[in-house]
A protein has these predicted regions:
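Short, hinge-like loop/turn segments at secondary-structure boundaries
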Residues: 86-90
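Short loop segments at secondary-structure junctions
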Residues: 91-92, 140
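Conserved, helical-rich catalytic subdomain that frames metal- and/or nucleotide-binding sites
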Residues: 94-98
Length: 161
């Protein structure tokens, strides 16, 4: 639907509104933070280490520059819970996550430690996330699936982010 007066695409605005959540309510402290370049653009990602589409998305995210990515490990598969928890017990959780999602390298730490996995599962459920991966832009717009890096770049431009 287009408003004739100024040719504004009302359908696109409605679509963004209906597929958005409040970015400020995301508990970023429960995510693994990785910064590339100046980190000025932001994304939140919900990802399961045993999800093949999450692995594809991770490869696409590696192509982006000047971005801060907050990865909420959303262990929705039973076999993902233990390694997801152990990621946070490693000296460098970001590196442990990268090795787990990209290479399938299991975390080596065997000690129990505080981790946000149960909170992340509850958060995902409260947001109505039914699968992985999910990409959330800093304006709250969310997209499901392994989104190509070129699409993410285009969406940043279209959304004015």
């Amino acid at each position: 639907m287009v408003r004739l007066k100024d040719q504004k695409n009302l359908s696109a605005a409605l679509y963004v509104q209906q597929n958005s959540l409040d970015w400020n309510k995301l508990p970023l402290k429960d995510a693994i933070k990785s910064v590339k370049g100046n980190g000025k653009r932001q994304l939140a990602v919900f990802s399961d280490p045993n999800c093949p589409y999450c692995k594809q998305l991770e490869a696409e995210l590696n192509k982006l520059n000047d971005v801060t990515i907050y990865t909420f490990i959303y262990a929705i598969k039973a076999q993902s819970i233990a390694p997801s928890k152990q990621v946070f017990c490693e000296a460098d959780p970001a590196l442990a996550w990268k090795n787990l999602i990209a290479k399938g390298t299991q975390p080596t730490s065997k000690k129990p430690c505080a981790n946000p996995i149960e909170r992340n599962i509850e958060l995902g459920r409260s947001l109505g996330l039914q699968g992985t991966p999910v990409v959330i832009f800093s304006n709250g717009f969310k997209v499901n699936g392994a989104v190509p890096s070129t699409t993410i770049e285009n969406m940043w431009r279209e959304l004015g982010l």
